[in-house]
From Swiss-Prot:
Region (Large ATPase domain (RuvB-L)): 4-196
Family: Belongs to the RuvB family.
EC code(s) of this entry: 3.6.4.-
InterPro entries with a match to the protein in the record: AAA+_ATPase (IPR003593), AAA_lid_4 (IPR041445), DNA_helicase_Holl-junc_RuvB (IPR004605), P-loop_NTPase (IPR027417), RuvB-like_N (IPR008824), RuvB_C (IPR008823), WH-like_DNA-bd_sf (IPR036388), WH_DNA-bd_sf (IPR036390)
Species, as recorded: Nocardioides sp. (strain ATCC BAA-499 / JS614)
The entry's keywords: ATP-binding, Cytoplasm, DNA damage, DNA recombination, DNA repair, DNA-binding, Hydrolase, Nucleotide-binding
Name the UniProt record assigns to this protein: Holliday junction branch migration complex subunit RuvB
Chain sites annotated for binding Mg(2+): 81
Chain spans, region Head domain (RuvB-H): 270-360
Recorded name of the encoding gene: ruvB
Record-listed DNA binding positions: 306, 325, 330
Alphabetized GO MF terms: ATP binding; ATP hydrolysis activity; four-way junction DNA binding; four-way junction helicase activity
Amino acid sequence: MTFHEEDLDQAEEVHVRSLTAAEADGDERAVEAALRPRTLDEVVGQVRVRDQLGLVLEAARRRGRAPDHVLLSGPPGLGKTTLAMIIASEMGAPLRLTSGPAITHAGDLAAILSGMNEGDVLFVDEIHRMSRPAEEMLYMAMEDFRVDVVIGKGPGATAIPLEIPPFTLVGATTRAGLLPGPLRDRFGFTAHLEFYEPDELDLIVQRSARLLDVHVLPDGTAEIASRSRGTPRIANRLLRRVRDFAQVRADGVVTLPVAQDALDLYEVDQLGLDRLDRGVLDVLCRRFGGGPVGISTLAVAVGEERETVEEVAEPFLVRNGFLARTPRGRVATPAAWEHLGLTAPPTLTLPESDPPLFED
């Protein structure tokens, strides 16, 4: 893949502006960063991924070379960005962060790559949303550590190779199936992050409570963990909201009743369903008789973007048996009807298997 020399300055400006905006994202992001594990040993859960990744990094250290490129996939909030930061930290390398939507032209990517030093780690979040020209340039950069710079225009144009020091690309995606095969095949290590178990989330909440200096009793952390949808990011967010409730409406100690009252106030029920989840199920059951309904129609009916329903609500609802994906659309399960206090149609049938959540 090639790009024109005159695109470089403009692309450099675009990248710097996007990167600065991402870093200055308010107090919420700063608190989340403070709660992130710093090493693989501090990571709770994801045992298989943690062990495999640790082996890859240790082998690279012993060889004195940059690790293979890494692709991390899975639902939002499970720790893909955290693992990218840990990879850089474990290798003692600088981390450069950007995102797929910010790389709209091949020149954007070339500007980033031209500033890389040997051993640097480049993290591209939402890598499946990169532009096609940038993807094609990335093929050569990942495999041969070079890109072609085009000098001039028309018949007299000349392509000059630009050498790039060996680096490690860490790509993160919630939709691995949208990545072209040639790009996916260039990652030496791929891992899919799974939802966390309640006991793992309990440990995460306990750790975060210590870092935030929140007094939480064991039954309080367990309650927060059980309503966190298997997602550490949500667990930490709920902990902060429960902390606020405890400080304002209680004596500052997060007990089981305090946690329950706080989470009920924020409309997170005992199974972890929030307003969006219940809205999806309610529309599906009441308006469409349980389905099947196409995802786009369902998103319009609940007043959300398709991506929000598909990537935030749907994985949790499918995993917990409230929603089924069929070739004809989404179908509410008997558990969904029961959770809403409704009676399921007597003819309700479900498919034996569903297509993968994140592969198409």
